[in-house]
Amino acid sequence: FKDDDGKIYCYFGGLWGGQLQWWRTLYHGFAPIPGKYGDDNGLIDLGPAPDHKTQLFAVPNAPAVPSNVVRMSDDVMQFAEAARPVIILDKDGEPLKAGDPHRFFEASWMHKYKGKYYFSYSTGDSHFLCYAIGDNPYGPFTYQGVILEPVVGWTTHHSIVEFKGQWYLFYHDCVPSNDITHLRSLKVQRLFYNEDGTIQKVINE
């Protein structure tokens, strides 16, 4: 994300067992500038959540369900607290079970829309991109539905951002790479909300 002082912060995971939780401070473009990394704790798919101007929340993946959320320090370069699990509830208020095809697997993302926090994620072997809504970054989040049906390339890693009043879904698909699953190509589609705040399902084109 880009802070008010013009710095650009990029968080990303690394290999299992090391080189994890990197950050870099950039002023112009994406030239490599040395950063540092945190504990070797097996985190992948790191991403900043909304409200970074007051408190930044990173949404890393734990080695197993569930995902975790943690508030960042004021300098946004380290964790300010212990990570907490992100709990996704069904419509009856019960946590999603491991056998549910819509449970969390990896690829955490969080964005904010009209005062609500949207936690979206990949379901792994069922290949859906799903989302849940909560009142704060810690949750709990209530499952809402599928954003994107399975694409070619196993899990769907994604991001949801707003640009000039329009929301967009970025994700990967392997069709442009002749269905070679480890050659993932970036795609983007416009994303729309219903009046009740739910997300309209995106059609992969």
Which residue stretches match the model-derived regions?
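Carbohydrate-active catalytic/glycan-binding domains of CAZyme proteins
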Residues: 1-205
